[in-house]
Amino acid sequence: MSIALKQVFNKDKTFRPKRKFEPGTQRFELHKRAQASLNSGVDLKAAVQLPSGEDQNDWVAVHVVDFFNRINLIYGTICEFCTERTCPVMSGGPKYEYRWQDDLKYKKPTALPAPQYMNLLMDWIEVQINNEEIFPTCVGVPFPKNFLQICKKILCRLFRVFVHVYIHHFDRVIVMGAEAHVNTCYKHFYYFVTEMNLIDRKELEPLKEMTSRMCH
């Protein structure tokens, strides 16, 4: 990553502190392995495959946290251009509108401006990944039985951030010289969720054409 790009993707651009794994734990080692997959020249399609002998839930957990951090960072770089005026509804072009529901304040799917949707989304994901009953940090503590279902919901909603950024704000990404970095993050995400079967194909439709060109 160039110095200029590092300045674009700095920690001050994120909405919230990054969730990290404790050094010396198995998940920290898996996290480092997942991080290394973004090094230049790495075969991303191969890098996302579950390592031999490793637990699927551990592998998914470190990637969900990692993708949350990265996608939060990507949105943070363009959030000043994503306003209630420019994006009055959270959408991915004219065909796709995303409504928010959390069974708390928003018990029914509700149309919201994109920045409000994004803030609710990031807050909601942060609550999930900081919940020890869902993402246990202590070695030996089991994941809940519905862990993969929760992760599927998180990843499905994170994909919508990519959809919105690519369709409505990619001109800003290009101006910042961050196109290659965002594309690599997207490819990593796409290969992972399809390899692990974590997102329904119909949810991937908004970026299908771009994905077919980018992810062979």
From Swiss-Prot:
GO biological process: regulation of hippo signaling; signal transduction
Annotated Gene3D superfamilies: MOB kinase activator
Name this polypeptide is given: MOB kinase activator 3B
Organism for this UniProt entry: Homo sapiens
Higher taxonomy: Eukaryota, Metazoa, Chordata, Craniata, Vertebrata
Gene behind this protein: MOB3B
Sample GO molecular function, one term: metal ion binding
Keyword annotations: Metal-binding, Zinc
Source organism, top-level taxon: Eukaryota
InterPro entries for this protein: MOB_kinase_act_fam (IPR005301), MOB_kinase_act_sf (IPR036703)
Classification via SMART domains: Mob1_phocein
Binding sites annotated in the UniProt record for Zn(2+): 82, 87, 164, 169
Keyword rRNA-binding set for record: no
